[in-house]
């Protein structure tokens, strides 16, 4: 629900979905579409493109037609694009500037467009222009995470994100269950992992698992793109979705404005 709440909190009433044609994007779209409809939002169009596509003009024209027709009804500040993709979105953004309404509305995304080097490096002007607010699961703030972040950054020059922290925690949980059971049998370890994870506060936060064996929901940071004084792009955190309260906090000093309301 994080993407839906993010768009609602930015005053969006109607949006166009542009997504990769694969199971990953379909999964995100299906959750978003249901959450969006449940809160009275309008989905103007669903546009699905093949994962290998590098020419987006026909899809962008389709979005332009739909969005330009919606401006009079909703207002430009209340319509948006939600894009579900990966590094190909950099190419899409470069081409989007030829479509005035598409390029004027705010864009939103998911973890596939957060902290994406191709977008930051190849389309910094365009990403900054449309903001491309993208959700990314957030690690708990702790000294453990901060220490690892600093060490990781010094070694590889990249942020130490939530998924990297989860991978680190998985390694520790696996090691602890192997030592406890004195076994590497998968079924033996599986029985121990719920308790071990429940009692573990790792780099990513509390490692508690749900009944399906998946990590419990986390908060989501909202990442965006902006230009540095030298004209290159950079990532920054624009807000936070709190999964406990279901509320979004926008960091207005960072984004430079107060988002409109519905």
Model-derived regions, located:
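Extracellular/periplasmic Venus flytrap/periplasmic-binding protein
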Residues: 1-98, 140-143
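Extracellular/periplasmic catalytic domains that process cell-envelope and extracellular macromolecules
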Residues: 9-11, 72-76, 99-102, 124-128, ...
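Cofactor-binding loop segments of dinucleotide-utilizing enzymes, especially the Rossmann-like FAD-
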Residues: 20, 110-112, 227
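Extracellular/periplasmic periplasmic-binding protein-like sensory domains
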Residues: 93-168, 182, 249-260
């Amino acid at each position: 629900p994080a993407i839906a709440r993010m768009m609602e909190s930015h005053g969006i009433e109607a949006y166009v979905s542009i997504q990769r044609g694969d199971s990953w994007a379909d999964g995100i779209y299906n959750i978003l579409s249901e959450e969006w409809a449940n809160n009275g939002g309008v989905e103007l169009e669903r546009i699905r493109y093949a994962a290998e596509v590098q020419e987006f003009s026909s899809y962008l024209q389709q979005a332009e037609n739909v969005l330009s027709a919606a401006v009079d009804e909703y207002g430009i500040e209340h319509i948006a694009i939600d894009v579900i993709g990966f590094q190909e979105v950099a190419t899409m953004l470069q081409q989007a500037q030829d479509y005035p309404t598409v390029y004027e509305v705010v864009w939103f995304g998911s973890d596939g467009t957060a902290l994406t080097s191709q977008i930051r490096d190849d389309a910094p002007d365009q990403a900054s222009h449309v903001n491309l607010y993208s959700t990314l699961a957030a690690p708990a703030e702790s000294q453990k995470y901060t220490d690892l972040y600093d060490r990781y950054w010094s070694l590889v020059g990249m942020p130490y994100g939530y998924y990297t922290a989860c991978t680190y925690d998985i390694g520790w949980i696996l090691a602890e269950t192997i030592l406890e059971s004195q076994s590497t049998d998968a079924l033996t370890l599986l029985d121990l992992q719920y308790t071990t994870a429940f009692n573990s506060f790792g780099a990513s936060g509390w490692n508690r698992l749900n009944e399906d064996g998946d990590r419990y929901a986390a908060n989501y940071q909202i990442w965006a793109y902006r230009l540095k004084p030298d004209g290159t792009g950079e990532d920054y955190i624009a807000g936070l979705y709190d999964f406990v309260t279901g509320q979004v906090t926008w960091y207005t000093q960072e984004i430079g404005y107060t988002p409109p309301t519905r």
